[in-house]
Amino acid sequence: MEKKVLIVLYELYKIYSGVTIKNSLKSIKFSVYCATRPGQEVWVLGSIPEFGNWGLNGACKLHWNKGHIWKGERIIERDIDYFEFKFVIEKKGKIEWWQEGGNNKINLKNITKDGKNKSGMYNYYNNSRYTYNHENGTLLIEYDWPDDDPGYDS
């Protein structure tokens, strides 16, 4: 009986919260080229709790790799179709630089099965590459920090 009540409550939550039931996106992987200064780190902040709701608390911290490639992955444990995000440079708990321009926007409803339809993805500089694998539910986002951005250390 308790299990049935929980299922009904969950179904009501989905209806009233506007959550679209898709169950396809499982994880988002990031690969960002950014030559940072000592002590700086690259994070992903965004419009959903998995990316801190635009704050560092709960955001996705990327990890430095050889060649100034920052990588990270965020597991998505709920159904989402749309979110916005930006890359930021952080040092000692303070955001030093936000990715310039408008927010990056991901609308999974507009991505084709081969994962190459960019009508569902928007990047201000048009210097991101997106690959969505419907079979394993993984979205890979690759980004090159622009050389002329003040947060970039050439």
Model-derived segments and spans:
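Aromatic-rich carbohydrate-binding modules that target alpha-glucans
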Residues: 35-80, 90-112
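Membrane-proximal basic amphipathic "stem/tether" segments
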Residues: 2-17
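A short, amphipathic beta-strand motif
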Residues: 27-32
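Exposed beta-strand face motif in extracellular beta-rich ectodomains
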Residues: 81-85
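Compositionally biased low-complexity segments at domain edges in trafficked proteins
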Residues: 116-154
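N-terminal edge beta-strand
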Residues: 23-24
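Beta-strand elements of modular eukaryotic interaction domains
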Residues: 19, 33-34
